[in-house]
Amino acid sequence: MKIFITGVAGFLGSHLADKFLSLGYKVGGNDNFLGGYRDNVNPKVMLYDFDCRDRHLMASILHGYDIVVHCAATAHEGLSVFSPSFITRNIYEASVSTMSAAITANVGRFVFCSSMARYGNQEAPFTEEMQTAPVDPYGIAKVAAEQTLKSLCDVHGMQWNIAVPHNIVGPRQRYDDPYRNVLSIMANRNLRKLPSYIYGDGNQLRCFSYIDDCISCIEKLALDSNIQSEIVNIGPDENPITINEAAKLVAKACKFKHTPIHTTDRPKEVKYATCSSDKARTLLGYETKTDVKTAIEKTVAYIKEKGPKEFDYSFGLEISDNAPETWKERLL
């Protein structure tokens, strides 16, 4: 069996590739390297350097593959209200292009990696039965891609599952991106002896997921023939913590005196965003094996090994009005 992973140089995609390879599957994948690191990619992966929006090339490459796991995304929810064209183009257009190519190439199953942004500002914990209610262009694009996938699969017979991973942390995560990955941003600053920035009062509530705890669930969504047409939250629902608490854990792991700088709230940021894991436990056997303290320590160890970096602002802002000062003034 052959499995193709989009965004295979990214955080999630590269770990999935390792998992499938360890199980004896042939793995191919592509990346445009906007967000991934080339050295994340296992040398056994058949790697293609191109953008998912190149539908014709994607279709030609996908011939012979049985499963596509679509991880590729500009996963920048907060940035999406300031660079909506860039973000939605690389979420919706890239996703639909890949779906179309997969159908053309007679791929049997498509696993779409969505986002908890699909739930918006509803009462937490979010369950899969909730209506989608995204509050920003990123979430809107993810939900539109989900709906398109279901529509296309209904017409053309391709199997589908949708994974909803949330707040994943661990080694290989992009840590020089100023717009996403809050714990890695804090660690990258603290390791350079710079204080963390916290948006608003810091009481935003999150459940952080360690990468290794999530991989087996996505593996089952890809490989288990008895699991079809399912949407599943992936990650823990126990022991949510505030951003203030997370910042203290990061500082401790970095051996840095914790003196955060509080700045204004980010527009459209959901205050209390946690997901129920009940369905993942029942259907996929999800289990939280790594607590948040250990997850942070492993993330910090990875950044230490790679070396902290200056932040990369190359994406820029399409709209600067009301954007966080940390982004406009490149303060990170």
Locate the predicted segments by residue.
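N-terminal Rossmann-like NAD(P)+-binding domain of SDR-like oxidoreductases, especially those catalyzing
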Residues: M1-P165, K306, N322-A323, W327
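C-terminal "lid/loop" region of Rossmann-like NAD(P)-dependent oxidoreductases
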Residues: D201, S229-N233, I241-A247, K255-Y272, ...
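Glycine/proline-rich active-site loop of Rossmann-fold NAD(P)-dependent oxidoreductases
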Residues: V143, H156, I168-S184, L194, ...
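Residue-level signal for the nucleotide or nucleotide-sugar donor/cofactor binding architecture
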Residues: R53, F82, N90-E93, D136, ...
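Non-catalytic, hydrophobic alpha-helical segments
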Residues: V68, C214, I218, I234, ...
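Hydrophobic alpha-helix immediately C-terminal to the catalytic Tyr-X-X-X-Lys motif of short-chain
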Residues: A144, T148, L152, V182, ...
